Regions:
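Extended, non-catalytic subsegments within catalytic or DNA/protein-binding/adaptor domains
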Residues: 1-315
Length: 315
């Protein structure tokens, strides 16, 4: 019966859920309990995130149309938690492996930085990594999708320096996934073949993009071409395959950046600031927990000086 009710609930036209139609259904069918029934009947067949999206879509409809939302928060949470716990293994994505500095250093051996595409891809890789940014914030989804109000350009790059002389390169992202007003990401000079400053300077020298074009545009035989996410990943996969390395997903760059900064001993709250997280969701991306925590749990006080500096005095 529950399955039949759930099918009936979502077999109606999507504009108005059936339990909100007072002229065609009884009051019983308009009760939020029907939504709980739907979620429970689908638990085990869909991912928890998918069912949560269904749930919140209905709630959004209530908000937009001024209809009272009668669902109790505790009931809603219990239903969604159960659905998430019963999600089939096939609905869960495997954890993405982090890209490491060793991996980037290996890739560098397969790049000819005198070539326009390689110069752009390697600069994009190092900038995305050390700024802990999303790959989509520095690449385009398609060749003709460039919008100067959405995508970063050479004119959006500037430099800042603190009172101690520490210099950082800042990229003003016009708009991001979490902020329509844009956000700033940044990195500092690094020692090694993966230095983002050297890679960016080389890219500017080889490709010489104008100030109002996509930041990592590269010189193609047909003219200046924006770097798309597909082109970026294609070049990374090719280099990885030549080295016999596993092809990593784009989001592995952001995960790898988190891991690298934490392994350097950068405090968790600073890593949150670098990655622009307002909450603790970044903890979901963590890998190698034991290695990260190791310096803080040793029998010898190797982190004592650091702890004294970072911890506030007792009141």
């Amino acid at each position: 019966m529950a399955t039949h009710h759930a099918r009936d609930l979502w077999s109606r036209p999507p504009s108005i859920p059936c339990f909100l139609r007072p002229k065609t259904n009884s009051r019983r069918l308009r009760m939020p309990r029907r939504l709980i029934t739907h979620v429970n009947s689908c638990a085990g067949s869909y991912s928890g995130k998918t069912l949560a999206n269904y749930f919140y879509t209905v709630r959004a409809w209530h908000t937009l149309h001024g209809v009272p939302w009668l669902m109790k928060p505790a009931e809603m949470k219990a239903a969604l938690d159960r659905a998430s716990a019963l999600a089939p293994p096939s609905s869960r994505r495997p954890k993405r492996a982090p890209i490491t500095l060793v991996f980037i250093s290996s890739l560098a051996t397969k790049f000819d930085l005198s070539k326009p595409l390689d110069a752009a891809v390697f600069a994009c890789l190092t900038t995305t990594f050390f700024s802990a940014a999303r790959l989509g914030e520095f690449t385009l989804p398609a060749l003709k999708s460039f919008d100067p109000s959405l995508h970063v350009k050479p004119g959006d790059v500037y430099y800042e320096q603190d009172r101690n002389g520490f210099r950082v390169t800042v990229f003003k992202l016009p708009r991001t996934k979490c902020s329509i007003n844009g956000e700033d990401v940044f990195w500092a000079v690094q020692e090694g073949v993966y230095d983002p400053q050297a890679a960016l300077a080389n890219h500017f020298s080889i490709n010489n993009p104008l100030k109002d074009v996509p930041l990592f545009s590269w010189r193609h035989s047909s003219g200046l071409r924006p770097l798309t996410k597909t082109e970026f990943l294609k070049r990374i996969y090719l280099a990885a395959s030549e080295l016999g390395l596993e092809s990593l997903k784009g989001h592995g760059i952001r995960i790898g950046a988190i891991l690298e900064y934490l392994l350097r001993g950068v405090p968790f709250d600073v890593v949150k600031s670098i990655g622009r997280w307002s909450g603790n969701s970044f903890l979901l991306y963590l890998r190698q927990h034991a290695v990260i925590i190791a310096p803080f749990i040793q029998g010898t006080p190797i982190m004592e000086a650091f702890t004294r500096y970072t911890m506030p005095p007792p009141r």
